[in-house]
């Protein structure tokens, strides 16, 4: 399989569905540091990135924001002093879609992990 960070997000259609948990558990190994969580009965991908100060955390947040805008797929970003928690999921499918794995991998590239 081509590296997730090199893949492009695909547009959603009315028949797009969330991935099964078993599929997610197989793919999670391809994105180091990420975990599969369930919130409001929906699977999500989450990772917390650490930084030496708020300035670098904010710069990372802005870089992820640029990436999200370019793909028109947006994560939940929680920026705090020295850390940023990024959570990806797809509202329209009520769970995790392949695009979320792609964006998580690309987020890791932004963080240099």
Swiss-Prot record:
Q: What InterPro entries does the annotation carry?
A: PCD_sf (IPR036428), Pterin-4-alpha-carb_dehyd (IPR050376), Pterin_deHydtase (IPR001533)
Q: Is Lyase a UniProt keyword of this protein?
A: yes
The record's keywords, sorted A to Z, are: Lyase
Give the EC number(s) under which this enzyme is classified: 4.2.1.96
Q: Record's SUPFAM superfamilies?
A: PCD-like (SSF55248)
> Do you know which PANTHER family this protein is assigned to?
PTERIN-4-ALPHA-CARBINOLAMINE DEHYDRATASE-RELATED
Could you say which protein family the record assigns here? Belongs to the pterin-4-alpha-carbinolamine dehydratase family.
Official protein name in the record: Putative pterin-4-alpha-carbinolamine dehydratase
| Organism lineage | Bacteria, Pseudomonadati, Chlorobiota, Chlorobiia, Chlorobiales
């Amino acid at each position: 399989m081509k590296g997730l960070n090199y893949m492009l997000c695909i547009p959603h259609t009315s028949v797009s569905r969330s991935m099964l948990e078993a599929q997610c558990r197989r793919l999670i190994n391809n994105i180091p540091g990420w975990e599969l969580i369930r919130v409001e009965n929906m699977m999500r991908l989450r990772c917390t990135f650490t930084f030496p100060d708020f300035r670098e955390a904010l710069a990372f947040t802005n870089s992820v924001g640029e990436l999200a805008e370019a793909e028109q797929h947006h994560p939940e970003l929680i920026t705090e002093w020295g850390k940023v928690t990024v959570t990806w999921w797809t509202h329209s499918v009520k769970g995790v879609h392949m695009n979320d794995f792609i964006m998580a991998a690309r987020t890791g590239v932004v963080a240099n992990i």
